[in-house]
Amino acid sequence: MFDIKAWAEYVVEWAAKDPYGFLTTVILALTPLFLASAVLSWKLAKMIEAREKEQKKKQKRQENIAKAKRLKKD
C-alpha cells in the first residue's frame, strides 16, 4: 500500500534540497488548474450577466403589459 508518511518526508526533503525545482514543479502542475478556474469563472460571470439581463427584460415586459391593461381598462 502507499505510505503517505514516507511520501511526505520525500517531498519535504526534496523541497529542502532543491527549493527552486520544487516550486517550479508545483507552479507548472497548478498552472492548468488556475487557467481552468479563470475560464470557468469568466463563463459563470457571463451567464449571470445574461440571466440578469433577461430578468430585467422580462420585468420590463410585465410592467408594460400591466400598464397597457390599466390604460385599456380606463
Curated annotation (Swiss-Prot):
GO terms for cellular component: membrane. It comes from the Eukaryota. Keywords: Coiled coil, Membrane, Transmembrane, Transmembrane helix. It is a single-pass membrane protein. The keyword Transferase does not apply. InterPro entries: Smim15. Residues 55-74 are annotated as: Disordered. Belongs to the SMIM15 family. This is Small integral membrane protein 15. It comes from Homo sapiens. The gene is SMIM15.
